[in-house]
């Protein structure tokens, strides 16, 4: 099967024929009626969708009827809604989901029932005791089904109520509920990089199969069919996240062709992790429909190509107030003393990315600097000039767990205190006056 982006432009992500609409002049397929996109009329919501298309005219009628069902808005006919329960799988990076009917629209996750799944099929439980329980934690509008349907971010527990090992949200929620942390109102802005791959050849989108494009330089924030690959996916994801209620704040093409970035935030506390996981789920669904593979590998292509990170911008209330630069420097000092702990928690395969090249610091050495993208921690010139603001932790890999990274930043900079001796030695080494 093929898919086509269903908007007012021509062409699409995969496939360019539009069977089922009849033919216009010169054999060109006729444009389909505007209809409904993701369950909402186009007039009501100007956004991009993906249409399911057949490979040949013999199945046109079936595909048209299926698309009508996919686009159907059930709101006028029933109060029932569809809730898509989403959770992190056994690898700690894969996402799983399944759907259930809820009797009426809901506004808060506390209104939703717990559910269960077969943990032996996700690598999260043994076959003889396979039940894992889903606890609904956050709700987003469903951009695929529209209407009152929802996406539900869940975390995972044993039947006895204990968090399973891949449940990183539970630990993060404990840290973010600490009074010392809540009083500091921690803000996070996360830059999620990702790479789009051709499905059948496992090679970046826009790259010649078995070959390489021209060197890096022309692709960052570029326009043009020879420099930008996958913009429809990035734009569809952007709009879908806005519709869902995710705090997405921007997108851009990245340095390596076929690689993109979007930013989520500022988000407070545990919300940062919920919004990143929900945004990843939506991106995975869109690439699924587009016939393109999404990878969060931090170094998908070896050689003179940029890796993929998940830079995490962070501030506390004290950092954002007058005199905040001194608080930022104290936070940097603490982060330097726990560098190994953070690196171990910042994503799989990060050693292939943090080489000291391609806008990264060395994985084994902690460093900081103003406007220096080759450091572990970067401070912006605006923060330096104003004497307050935020820091950017450039170490996290694109496949990092956002619950782990955000909670660890808060713990290290707010709750943890080094010994005076260790603090003095680190301050001298980093040339920090705190």
Swiss-Prot record:
Catalyzed reaction equations: L-glutamate + NH4(+) + ATP = L-glutamine + ADP + phosphate + H(+)
Subcellular location: Plastid, Chloroplast
Span list, region Disordered: 1-33, 101-126
EC number: 6.3.1.2
The keyword RNA-binding belongs to this UniProt entry's keyword annotation: no
Pfam families: Gln-synt_C (PF00120), Gln-synt_N (PF03951)
Gene Ontology molecular function terms on file: ATP binding; glutamine synthetase activity
Annotated S-S bridges: none
Chain intervals with Gly residues compositional bias: 10-25
GO cellular component: chloroplast
Plastid found in the keyword field: yes
Transit sequence range: 1-54
Domain annotation GS beta-grasp: ranges: 81-161
Any Gene Ontology biological process: glutamine biosynthetic process
Enzyme class: ligase
Domain GS catalytic, chain residue ranges per copy: 168-434
Subunit text: Homooctamer.
Other comments on record: In barley, there are distinct isozymes in the chloroplast, and cytoplasm.
Function text: The light-modulated chloroplast enzyme, encoded by a nuclear gene and expressed primarily in leaves, is responsible for the reassimilation of the ammonia generated by photorespiration.
UniProt similarity note: Belongs to the glutamine synthetase family.
Record protein name field: Glutamine synthetase leaf isozyme, chloroplastic
Organism whose genome encodes this protein: Hordeum vulgare (Barley)
């Amino acid at each position: 099967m093929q898919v086509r982006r269903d908007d007012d432009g021509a062409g699409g992500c995969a496939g360019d024929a539009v069977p089922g609409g009849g033919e216009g002049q010169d054999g060109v397929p006729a444009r389909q009626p505007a209809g409904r996109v993701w369950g909402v009329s186009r007039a009501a919501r100007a956004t991009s969708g993906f249409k399911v298309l057949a490979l040949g005219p013999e199945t046109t009628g079936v595909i048209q009827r299926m698309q009508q069902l996919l686009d159907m808005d059930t709101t006028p006919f029933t109060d029932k809604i569809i809730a898509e329960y989403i959770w992190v799988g056994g690898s700690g990076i894969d996402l799983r989901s399944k759907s259930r009917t809820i009797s009426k629209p809901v506004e808060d996750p506390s209104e939703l029932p717990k559910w269960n799944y077969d943990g032996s099929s996700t690598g999260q439980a043994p076959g003889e005791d396979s039940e894992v329980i889903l606890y609904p934690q956050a709700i987003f509008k469903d951009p695929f089904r529209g209407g009152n349907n929802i996406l539900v971010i869940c975390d995972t527990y044993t039947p006895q109520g204990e968090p399973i090992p891949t449940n990183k949200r539970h630990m993060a929620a404990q840290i973010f509920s600490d009074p010392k942390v809540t009083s500091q109102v921690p803000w996070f802005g996360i830059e999620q990089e990702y790479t789009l791959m051709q499905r059948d050849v496992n090679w970046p989108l826009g790259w010649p199969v078995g070959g390489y494009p021209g060197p890096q330089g022309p692709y960052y924030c570029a326009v043009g069919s020879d420099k930008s690959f996958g913009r429809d996916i990035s734009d569809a994801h952007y709009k879908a996240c806005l519709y869902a209620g995710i705090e997405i704040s921007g997108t851009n093409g990245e340095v390596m062709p076929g690689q993109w970035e979007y930013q989520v935030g500022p988000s407070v506390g545990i919300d940062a992790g919920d919004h990143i996981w929900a945004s990843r789920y939506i991106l995975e669904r869109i690439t699924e429909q587009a016939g393109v593979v999404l990878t969060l590998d931090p170094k998908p292509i070896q050689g003179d190509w940029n890796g993929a990170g998940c830079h995490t911008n962070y501030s506390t209330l004290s950092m954002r107030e007058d005199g905040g630069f001194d608080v930022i420097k104290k936070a940097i000092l603490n982060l330097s003393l726990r560098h190994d702990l953070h690196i171990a928690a910042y994503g799989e395969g990060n050693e292939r990315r943090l080489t000291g090249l391609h806008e990264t610091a060395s994985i084994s050495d902690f460093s900081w600097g103003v406007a220096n993208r080759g450091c572990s921690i970067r401070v912006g010139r605006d923060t330096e000039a104003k004497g307050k603001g935020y820091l950017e932790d450039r170490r996290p890999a694109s496949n990092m767990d956002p619950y782990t990274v955000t909670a660890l930043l808060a713990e290290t900079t707010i709750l943890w205190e080094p010994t005076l001796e260790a603090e003095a030695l680190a301050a001298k080494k980093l040339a920090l006056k705190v």
